A protein has these predicted regions:
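Short, glycine-biased loop/turn motifs at secondary-structure junctions and
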Residues: 1-99
């Protein structure tokens, strides 16, 4: 499924705010000139923070951030991909797992 709209979610980053060789920042807006496709193209995120750990091992040094997708969004199961992503703020502690 692919749609255009505003979708809120969560994304996991390495301690230096990188993910898959791409540098992010918090806060920040990022765009890719791609048609998003889960597991293929775009910046990936999950609507629920706890779902992120289906794809990443829990590491207390990693960053978990609230994100908003503004562009096209592809969704498959509990994972989404977009071509326009805003990193809003870091979510600290284990409280994010309840989100």
């Amino acid at each position: 499924m692919s749609e255009i709209g505003v979708v809120k979610g969560f994304k996991v980053f390495n301690p230096d705010w990188t993910c898959k060789n791409k540098q992010y920042g918090c806060p920040g807006r990022f765009e890719e000139d791609v048609t998003p496709s889960v597991c293929n193209e775009g910046m990936h995120f999950c609507k629920r923070a706890s779902d992120c750990f289906n794809y990443y091992s829990f590491d207390p040094n990693n960053k978990v951030a609230e994100v908003i997708a503004y562009g096209e969004v592809s969704e498959e199961g509990d994972k989404c991909a977009t071509n326009k992503l805003e990193v809003v703020r870091e979510t600290r502690g284990l409280n994010c797992l309840a989100l």
